[in-house]
Amino acid sequence: LGEGVSLVRDMFVADTMEEAKEKAGEHMVNYMRWVCHWRGLGNHMDPGEELPETKGKLDLLNYEFLHKRNMLFGTPEYVIDKIKELKSELNLQNLQVWSNFPGVKHEDCMKSIKLFTEKVIPHFKDDLDTEVKKVS
């Protein structure tokens, strides 16, 4: 079927796990409330996973629910480990990161991107395909 998997992941890199949650966590959850209002939580669940019954379809949507499923929010080391896990489990070929969320301060977003480019990406330099390809 192909050589690997391409994924989009929400990303916020900070000096500590707590800082990532504090500076971007609630903004991410608020954004996902809007997205999941239409799509539900199914895109964030593992195959075969069943959630407990709740009154509202988004009652379980919080930072902890999202973080363990598809967020690259945390220290550079945490993000590196999560990317390695995705590569190992899914034969990850391409990773695209969504790095700005409504409400996150510009300077916090820029620091996160800087940490990602300076501390995370170098760990995957052998995997980078820098060839420019013509799209027809």
Segments predicted by a language model, with ranges:
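C-terminal helical cap(s) of enzyme catalytic domains, especially alpha/beta-barrels
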Residues: K105-D129
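Flexible loop/turn segments at secondary-structure boundaries
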Residues: A14-T16, G103-H106
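An alpha-helical appendage that flanks or caps ligand/catalytic pockets
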Residues: L1-L92, K125-S136
